[in-house]
């Protein structure tokens, strides 16, 4: 379904919004760069090896890495906008792959308890985000920074919004377009 079609029919049910964590609300990439003593994660020589090292380090190291992520200002603005406009949302975040995935999920829940406490009870942790793209035949919305998840979401019939913390205004403008018909009901 196209965004214009969704907006044309104001009798439709409001699409549910799913909000990513890492790279949207929590500064995974800044922490990952710091862990490797580089200014930007793109300077990590072999990112696949680096993520595998974290994934197989120890449950404590994985937990501490995710629990200590700094909140991103742009993600905070998105959450604030959603709350101001009474847009229900669920956090939808992928756990770290590997043997300590559970430790990453526990850390993410604890992070949410501190930084976005109302989101914890409905948070979903899965590598298969695209399974939430539709509610029956109606599209849901995903705000994410990772192209792979956005493409899978769109291909499954959902509405994908690419978030960049440096351009939060774009994310909010896209949300305004989608949710405008539902804001003054």
Show the residue positions of the predicted features.
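Acidic, Mg2+-coordinating phosphoryl-transfer loop and its flanking beta/alpha structural elements
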Residues: 140-176
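Substrate-recognition element of Asp-dependent hydrolases with the DxDx(T/V) motif
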Residues: 68-70, 75-106, 112
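Active-site neighborhood of HAD-like aspartate-dependent phosphohydrolases
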Residues: 6-60, 155
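Substrate-recognition "cap/lid" segment bordering the active-site pocket of phosphatases
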Residues: 93-140, 150
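A short, conserved beta-to-alpha structural element at the edge of catalytic cores
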Residues: 44-53, 57, 161-182
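Charge-dense, intrinsically disordered terminal/linker segments
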Residues: 1-16, 24, 36, 71, ...
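Short catalytic/ligand-binding loop motif for oxyanion handling, primarily in non-cytosolic enzymes
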Residues: 26-29, 34, 89-91, 98-102, ...
């Amino acid at each position: 379904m196209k965004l214009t079609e969704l907006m044309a029919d104001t009798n439709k049910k409001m699409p549910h919004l799913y909000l990513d964590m890492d790279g949207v609300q929590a500064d995974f990439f800044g922490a990952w760069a710091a862990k490797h003593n580089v200014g930007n994660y793109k300077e990590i020589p072999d990112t696949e090896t680096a993520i595998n090292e974290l994934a197989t380090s120890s449950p404590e190291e994985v937990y501490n890495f995710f629990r200590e992520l700094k909140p991103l200002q742009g993600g905070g603005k998105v959450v604030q906008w959603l709350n101001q406009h009474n847009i229900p949302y669920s956090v939808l975040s992928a756990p770290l792959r590997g043997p300590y995935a559970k430790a990453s999920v526990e850390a993410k829940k604890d992070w949410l308890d501190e930084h976005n406490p109302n989101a914890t009870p409905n948070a979903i942790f899965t590598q298969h985000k695209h399974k939430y793209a539709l509610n029956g035949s109606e599209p849901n919305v995903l705000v994410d920074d990772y192209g792979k998840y956005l493409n899978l979401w769109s291909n499954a019939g959902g509405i994908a919004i690419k978030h960049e913390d440096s351009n939060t205004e774009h994310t909010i403008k896209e949300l305004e377009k989608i949710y405008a018909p539902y804001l003054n009901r």
